[in-house]
């Protein structure tokens, strides 16, 4: 597995900070925020792209590709895979982004207005389009299996992982490198989400701005980074002695068919999605132990996900823990499902549920167990990671304790 995110640039550091409830939310300093309504976010800190790419390579890529490549390289190295002429066509890549090269697009648009089309870089298009993380990973390692990138807003990472698992299940690959990446803390990214009134405006206290299920939550916090996992057919992994973090046992999808940005009333769409994941995993509701929630800290979204859990799990919803790591990382949009798949797998490995920090006054309409402000040691055999996106696109992966 590999990760680059606001609380750490590798799996070990990020997980340690998540379990200890460390916030990665800080004032934004990569752009001038003087005219912005929101001046903070979940930035990646102390990232050194030269650890992963040469200056020549990095120059041809937007920052979202830098993050995706870094997480992908970490995951590939962690897997211990060796690519040979005989297995290359059985290894593929599915790493997406919700928005893609927004920074490069903004800068190129400014350059076009100032100096005309002849000054546009020949690398503008390949440096900014979303599928180039998968493309560059394939080129770097000579991976000749399926090579694609799903784009579904904030569900992107989860859909790439889930669909990659289906590729393996269908027999089209033995191994898939999958996840999501994003770098949208740009002038238009920050300004656009603020204009939609989706973001917290708690500029005076960034660290507590992301407060899922708290009665005073006022929107999500924009974050950047990438999360990538290596999926492998079990017998194939077992034969080569691979380290197995867990089993991706279920995958569910659904559509709200309701509104461009709001969740369906009562969480009905999200509930169907979770039910589909459990059905695919062949487990009953009462076998689920933990949910890594979408949990974005929006007024409508947090209630809808609480209602969805109740609808999907019935009375058992009172027995599970559902926490939001976005309280520490912010919302990484297309990368959210990637980093949260990593956190969910580690929760199962270490038998501990990450906390939801910043719950100071729990909303009475959100009445489940959210592991408020402190990690919870507990039995976790089966866990769901949820992602829900604009357009009513929903995805849930179900990870189970490995054989």
Name these PLM-found stretches:
Residues 29, 172-218, 251-265, 295-302, ...:
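Acyl-CoA/ACP chain-elongation machinery
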Residues 26-70, 76, 100-163, 172, ...:
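Conserved catalytic cysteine-centered active-site region
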Residues 68-79, 133, 160, 232-233, ...:
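Short, well-ordered amphipathic alpha-helical segments that serve as non-catalytic structural scaffolds
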Residues 85-88, 281-287, 315-318, 367-403:
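Flexible, low-complexity linker/loop segments at domain and module junctions
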Residues 65-97:
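Feature captures the FAD/FMN-dependent oxidoreductase FAD-binding
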Residues 18, 72, 93, 137, ...:
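Conserved small-residue
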Residues 1-57, 79, 235-245, 342-356, ...:
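ACP-dependent fatty acid/polyketide chain-elongation machinery
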Residues 22-26, 204-281, 289-290, 359:
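Condensing-enzyme catalytic core mediating Claisen C-C bond formation in acyl metabolism
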């Amino acid at each position: 597995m590999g990760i680059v995110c606001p609380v750490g640039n590798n799996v070990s550091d990020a997980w340690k900070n998540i379990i200890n409830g460390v916030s990665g939310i800080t004032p934004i300093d990569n752009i001038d925020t003087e005219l912005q309504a929101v001046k903070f976010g979940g930035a990646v800190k102390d990232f050194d792209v030269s650890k992963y790419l040469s200056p020549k390579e990095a120059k041809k890529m937007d920052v979202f590709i830098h993050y995706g490549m870094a997480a992908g390289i970490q995951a590939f190295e962690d897997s211990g895979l060796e690519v040979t002429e005989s297995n290359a066509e059985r290894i593929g890549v599915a790493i997406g982004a919700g928005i893609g090269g927004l920074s490069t697009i903004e800068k190129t648009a400014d350059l076009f207005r100032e100096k005309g089309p002849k000054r546009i870089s020949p690398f503008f298009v390949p440096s900014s389009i979303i599928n180039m993380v998968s493309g560059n990973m394939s080129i770097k390692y000579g991976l000749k299996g399926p090579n694609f990138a799903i784009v579904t807003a904030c569900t992107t990472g989860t859909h790439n992982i889930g669909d990659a698992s289906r590729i393996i299940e269908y027999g089209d690959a033995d191994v898939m490198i999958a996840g999501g990446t994003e770098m949208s803390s740009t002038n238009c990214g920050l300004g656009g989400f603020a204009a939609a009134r989706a973001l917290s405006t708690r500029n005076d206290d960034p660290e507590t701005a992301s407060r899922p299920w708290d009665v005073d939550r006022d929107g999500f916090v924009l974050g950047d980074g990438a999360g990538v996992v290596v999926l492998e057919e079990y017998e194939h992994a077992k034969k080569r002695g691979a380290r197995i973090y867990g089993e991706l046992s279920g995958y569910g999808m659904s559509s709200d068919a309701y509104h461009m940005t709001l969740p369906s009333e009562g969480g009905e769409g999200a509930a169907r999605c979770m039910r589909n994941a459990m059905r695919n995993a062949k487990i009953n509701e009462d076998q689920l132990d933990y949910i890594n929630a979408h949990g974005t800290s929006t007024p409508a979204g947090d209630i809808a996900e609480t209602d969805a859990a109740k609808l999907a799990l019935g009375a058992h919803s009172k027995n599970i823990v559902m926490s939001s790591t976005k309280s520490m990382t912010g919302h990484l949009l297309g990368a959210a499902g990637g980093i949260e798949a990593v956190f969910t797998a580690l929760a199962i490995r270490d038998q501990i549920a990450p906390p939801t920090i910043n719950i100071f006054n729990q909303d009475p309409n959100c009445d489940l167990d959210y592991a408020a402000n402190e990690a919870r040691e507990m039995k976790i055999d089966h866990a769901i990671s949820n992602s829900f996106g604009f357009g009513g696109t929903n995805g849930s992966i179900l990870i189970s304790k490995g054989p």
